[in-house]
Amino acid sequence: MNKKHTLISLAILTALYSQQSLADLHEQCLMGVPKFSGEVVTGDVNSLPVYIEADNAEINQPNDATYQGNVDLKQGNRHLLAQSVQVKQSGNQSTPLRMAYVRNGFDYKDNQINMLGKDAEFNLDSHDGNLTNSEYEFVGRQGRGKADNITLHNNYRVMKNATFTSCLHGDNAWAVDASEIRQYVKEEYAEMWHARFKIHGVPVFYTPYLQLPIGDRRRSGLLIPSAGTSNRDGLWYAQPIYWNIAPNYDLTFTPKYMSRRGWQANGEFRYLTSIGEGKVAGEYLGKDRYSEYASDNRKRHLFYWNHNSSFLQNWRLNINYTRVSDKRYFNDFDSIYGRSTDGYANQYARIAYYQPNYNFSLSAHQFQIFDDIVNIGPYRAVPQLDFNYHKYDLANGWLNFKLHSQAVRFDNDSKLMPTAWRFHAEPSLNSLMSNKYGSLNIETKLYATRYEQKKGSGKNAEDVQKTVNRVIPQFKVDLQSVLSRDITFLKEYTQTFEPHVQYLYRPYRNQSNIGSTLNNDYLGFGYDSALVQQDYYSLFRDRRYSGLDRISSANQVTLGGTTRFYDIAGEERFNLSAGQIYYLSNSRIDENPANKTPTSSSAWALESNWKISNKWYWRGSYQFDTHTNSTSLANTSLEYNPEKNNLIQLNYRYVNQEYIDQNLGKSANAYQQDIQQVGLVVGWEIANNWAVVGRYYQDLALQKPVEQYLGVQYNSCCWAASVGVKRNVTNHQNQTRNEIVYDNSIGITLELRGLGSNDHQSGIQEMLEKGKLPYIRAFSLD
């Protein structure tokens, strides 16, 4: 078998021959856990009376009583069954001490723990007790074991020569033997001294001290490690260490050793306060020993900060900041804080104030790009001040007024690039008329912009016009309607047709004097403008360019429409949208012929979604250039999703080279040709608690696989193990244009389960999210 098809074949076979998935694993595991029968008594249980039944009783009031044969003792939530119980009372009548002595075996139950043992002593007033040769099992959650001696207290239990496991009866996959175990009931954790970790009864690990959670509360300590191997990292091992600093603060520190790179320190701090929540993370490798960088003494690092807060009722603060040491960081390291396929790291901060009819904000925004070809990076917008205002229902409800205004300074790391202040005001008036047949929106708008530009300080920096004033009016008429009918050939279905017609006019202004000409190939136009990627919904946008530096002329009519099919329950099952722009005159931004619409109409754009059934979903989009009779862009996805975690998805995507260069710049496609990829993603839960994920993407133009992944996870009630094998396209320094470089890696994760209430996940979602091309669900009409 051809090697590149091996992973995909395994994924298909797994799906075809899998048995019906078992019920939810968490529910299965709870079926083997004892449950408390009856209603839980709250309050001070110790103050409740004690009820005793037995075959025989010898009572010597008020000091003692002996019960023999089928003794049944109850107090609140406590229930004791035994063959012999002696109850003694001492002290005075106001503060009596009541003790129960159990001999020749007992069965004790309450709402937290069940115990079987030989002999026991109970203080019926304080609930303290001492048990010998006992077996115990938690109520309502996994956890059981044995102990030579158990001392019970109100909030904790002390066990001597004890064992603990979260495995159910009949499963001895793992257990911990310890000279002493202390289980803290309210805090929900256990301390163990001289702990020996055993797998199927065989000791494999010893530690003088160990902590394990026995509930849902977060606890400081070691988390589950992971290990693996890859071409770039060599053998690697990562050990997370968790510190529960406070209920609203925690820190996870993860040292990671890579045999080919060295030690990497990773940390993540999470916080939740009255004025906001967020996450601060860092990754640091002091010296990268990988062969490509060994002579550079290169430090590799990442910093990440995400923060969201609301304060003083009307104020909002948002920060999303990621910075890495170099452009190749996400190529060389797997990180949850970014991917190489993103193309850039976002660095953004914004503080805003909101009122019902206006808001203003102060922000700073820049990008760190990863493209090796680009020597001049994008502009940073620091500072940027925005003010928005609206007033509706003017002129007796006929008019609505909106105002967007902005002042922003643009700067660049390159001394060849000019800097600028941009001042912009954008008032608009619109009148919206609607009835049951549709709506008509008439809008007029004015773009008034002033630039104060300064030549770059570099030796060969180009001259720029110091002051540029640009005023562009806009007029738009937008007509929409909704028509419906019952379908004769599809009984119990209703079809709607929603025609959409828009006329847009904006006069031409030559804007070549805004910004530099050096950044057009890779960074768009001006300071923050670039062509917007096209789809059906973009046909009705006001502008072809993002940002404000390029506002193209427009004299165009857009015709489009959407048809929808609804079933008898009113659920949308299918839709299809199609449209095209007809240019009455060329749309231009300057005198360069390359920057105008070359034809009298845009490409046809189509979007469609089909919920074939509750298990099958299909989505597709397509753009066809009628003037070249060629496809500009196409993608489709078909997904079978019978259950929550079971899915098979087949997808295809195509983008021609002309579309890429026009919309994304020449640097977006290193191979200078069309992108044509087919992919298959399989995620399936199969019998005996196995889960498998297979992912394969093939570039049909390059005739090379882009990414291959096979992940297998075994899940039981008390442990899980996963293995992931991955092969994906990467790159290295000084790589030639036609060279394809792959990174092969294997990752292994072991996990103890049953220690919390929500740790029985199949692992499919985690495996689907791994990789350069993570799974994206086919859009459905749910």
UniProtKB/Swiss-Prot annotation:
Superkingdom assignment: Bacteria
GN (gene name): lptD
Keyword line: Cell outer membrane, Membrane, Signal
Gene3D superfamilies attached to this UniProt entry: Lipopolysaccharide (LPS) transport protein A like domain
InterPro entries to which the protein is assigned, alphabetical: LipoPS_assembly_LptD, LptD, LptD_C, OstA-like_N
Residue pairs linked by disulfide bridges in the UniProt entry: none
Assembly and interaction partners: Component of the lipopolysaccharide transport and assembly complex. Interacts with LptE and LptA.
Lineage, uppermost ranks: Bacteria, Pseudomonadati, Pseudomonadota, Gammaproteobacteria, Pasteurellales
GO BP annotation list: Gram-negative-bacterium-type cell outer membrane assembly; lipopolysaccharide transport
Pfam families: LptD (PF04453), LptD_N (PF03968)
Location of this chain's protein in the cell: Cell outer membrane
Family of the protein in this entry: Belongs to the LptD family.
Signal peptide residues on this chain, from the entry's feature table: 1-23
Organism from which the protein derives: Haemophilus influenzae (strain 86-028NP)
GO cellular component entries: cell outer membrane; transporter complex
Role noted for this protein: Together with LptE, is involved in the assembly of lipopolysaccharide (LPS) at the surface of the outer membrane.
The name this protein goes by in its record: LPS-assembly protein LptD
